[in-house]
Amino acid sequence: MSESNLSSFISTNYFNLRSAANSSNSISKPSTKKSIRNQKSPTNISSWALKKKTLQIAETTWENNEKDSTHSHYLMTGSMASRTATSLSRYSTNASLLGPSIDCVLCCIYEVPRDISTRIGLCIINCNTGQMYLSDFMDSQIYIRVVHKLQIYQPTEILIPSSSLAPTVSKLATMIKFNVAETVKIEEGSRKCFNSQDGLAAITKYLMDDTKKDLKIEEIIDKTFALCAASAAISYMEEIISKSSRNLNAFRKLRIQFEGTENTMLIDSKTVRGLELVENKLDKNGISLWKFLDTTSTKMGQRSLRNSILQPLTDRGSIEMRLEALEELKANDDLLQKLRLEMKSLPDLDKLFSRLLCINHSAIKPDQRINYVLLLKETLQSVKSLKDALNDQLIQSRLISETKKIFNNDAIMEIEKLINSCINEDCVWASSAIQLLNQRSYAVKSDSNGLLDVSRQIYKEVKEEFFREVEDLTAKNKINLDHNYDSARGFYLRIKRQEFTDDVATLPDVFISRTIKKNYIECTTLNIIKKNARLKEVMEEILLLSEETVDELLDKIATHISELFMIAEAVAILDLVCSFTYNLKENNYTIPIFTNNLLIRDSRHPLLEKVLKNFVPNTISSTKHSSSLQIITGCNMSGKSVYLKQVALICIMAQMGSGIPALYGSFPVFKRLHARVCNDSMELTSSNFGFEMKEMAYFLDDINTETLLILDELGRGSSIADGFCVSLAVTEHLLRTEATVFLSTHFQDIPKIMSKKPAVSHLHMDAVLLNDNSVKMNYQLTQKSVAIENSGIRVVKKIFNPDIIAEAYNIHSLLKIAKARTENEDSNGVVDQKTINQMKRIHNLVAILKECAGNEKEPLTLGKLKEINSDFIENFEE
């Protein structure tokens, strides 16, 4: 199979096997870039706001639910006539309550352009969920971490200091320009807006009051660059809200979190795109690792999965806590199914709870606050079901035990008591306009307000008068009258057309505002119009009195906001590990362990194994002393690129805390991952080679012993002489860094030269020459390099004219003769190489024995020792 068609093949075939529901999870970004406007520096925050389109945050509107009385009016997509009839779903929650599905994210980046160092302060505010993330770090010369953060959070608007744009555009501003979509607005602010003291004051103001508040302030007090970014971001947000408060959520508190760079793996943006971690390169709706692994039940879990893919864990203890949870859930299938089923009923908790952070609950329209309370109550009941499911089990894993502890928090019962003290317990979701009317009228308990009881009695009397009016009109005019209600007209009359066959003009004059519909004739009377006016007045009084009670209730619930967000985070992590466990069982994955060496037995490509029959697994092995740098050679289309991507994807999955597609997996913890994988669809020229080398020169400085580096076709697109020299020099440098490196190359002399080094291993993708001179690919990695002469010519034999193929063979023969004349074989070199290979096998034996001795799950047995010994003796003399 052609490597260039790999992505499209996976996308086409995989979607034939998997439900199309997952296609809704894709995140698409336009490929074109936005140029930075080199505008005059503003003098204050206000001048920014005059130039920019305000952040788009939809208000929670519910009018559309009540416009057409001939249809069911859903507060959620799906009938909710009773709480137990249909569970809530993350896809069914009405977006008008929880806001738009695409988050509005503000990102403020602070730098000092003239400073030699590349220190960065970052502040990201999610305007839908009320979350703020702060970072302060030293970046590389090409700002890999900044671009990484932009890729993770996908901001809709970016703020940078005016000094980054004038008098000259800084390198950071240029990197931002080329790594965001054209829909992202890039704005500037004056230097005085970036003030660390103002930032600290703003954070103190917006930080939620809980037991960890002082610790959080202490954590960020010396992060001056992050505080500068926070100062400008919060000032900008407040300025925009003050100018357009109707369309924006005015948060009184924010969920503030400082994100260090030491606990997550750094994956540069080109690696993210090349490995197709979150988006397919060829088709934005195509398959990616994120979409493939996404079997989550909630929006929170889905976001957590994406973040885990882009930022795998580097803290070994945290990874092993997730793996421990996988072990427990794997052994308890009933619990796994019950938890996944219960979580499917949950709405987006981050967005739901964030509405309580807004000033005066402005994110919830007054006439919809009862609906919000009902959704909150429904959510807490689902959380209690999760709690009951966990309480019924003897939980051993630390991670699930912690979520169980959070679900047993007394705050849940206290919030339920508060709701039940104000809202009638039999109040449920409405499915029609008249039910909505009754719900608003009777949701609040009668003993909450004396005036409310009086208004309700009047409301009841007016409705009874209307019903009597309908009965009188029916009896007087000998017409079978029906009635209905919608929010625009109030009550009105309906006559079935099949029962009234006469002309509409023959109706008595008392019936006015006649409208002919498909099945009904709709009309009203003057008396009904008067009663509707009276009913509207009474309803306004009821709603006003009810709103006062509900507002007080929301204020009391908001005092438990910290506990509610703890619940949201607990659900997210529980959903994530349940998703990992589901994938583990469905895809026959194994749970990895973490040691000092990389050993993956019979590894499989997680996506390709699902669409290719008889996928050939390969064992991956890398130790520091004998094979830290592995050079892969082989024919074109022999599977080198697939193997290299496979290595990277499996390492990412392991550090996410997920199962892996292999029989066994032992991993070191990598803190950086850089991959440059071949894209055969792109034209390869010397200019591509120059760009490749220039880019590589930048991130070579970012490589250390904890880096995993994947290089596909090192030196591709280059001339033979120059490309070979540079590629060999790069390989030599990579060896000195002691990083874990997997690279493939078309320069056959590189492995010949480098394999004499103790830490270098040369592996080959096996292929067989058949009797008809065609080449059969076995896709199997071997240590024996068997070169098939003219393999490239044989692969394209059926494509070109026979005369061209014959000429190619002739040229190859001439080049082979010329090379033989100049080669000076050194027989001692053969002896030296054999000695080196034997030393490598000794190092490998030591590493394997240490691995087996430290593996508590698979104790070292006599039989296993004999197997290792036999394998070592058999291969030692090769």
Curated annotation (Swiss-Prot):
Entries under SUPFAM superfamilies matching the protein: DNA repair protein MutS, domain II, DNA repair protein MutS, domain III, P-loop containing nucleoside triphosphate hydrolases
SMART domains: MUTSac (SM00534), MUTSd (SM00533)
Keyword flag DNA-binding: yes
Alphabetical list of Pfam families matching this protein: MutS_II, MutS_III, MutS_IV, MutS_V
Classification via InterPro entries: DNA_mismatch_repair_Msh2, DNA_mismatch_repair_MutS_C, DNA_mismatch_repair_MutS_clamp, DNA_mismatch_repair_MutS_core, DNA_mismatch_repair_MutS_sf, DNA_mmatch_repair_MutS_con_dom, MutS, MutS_con_dom_sf
GO cellular component labels: DNA repair complex; MutSgamma complex; nuclear chromosome; nucleus
Region (Disordered): 22-41
Highest taxon in the source lineage: Eukaryota
Residues that, per the record, bind ATP: G634, C635, N636, M637, S638, G639, K640, S641
GO molecular function, one term: mismatched DNA binding
GO biological process, one term: reciprocal meiotic recombination
Keywords linked to the UniProt accession: ATP-binding, DNA-binding, Meiosis, Nucleotide-binding
Function: Involved in meiotic recombination. Facilitate crossovers between homologs during meiosis.
PANTHER family tied to this protein: DNA MISMATCH REPAIR PROTEIN MUTS FAMILY MEMBER, MUTS PROTEIN HOMOLOG 4
Quaternary structure note: Heterooligomer of MSH4 and MSH5.
Family: Belongs to the DNA mismatch repair MutS family.
Note: Two distinct classes of crossovers have been demonstrated in budding yeast. Class I is MSH4/MSH5 dependent and exhibits crossover interference. Class II is MUS81/MMS4 dependent and exhibits no interference.
UniProt protein name: MutS protein homolog 4
Organism: Saccharomyces cerevisiae (strain ATCC 204508 / S288c) (Baker's yeast)
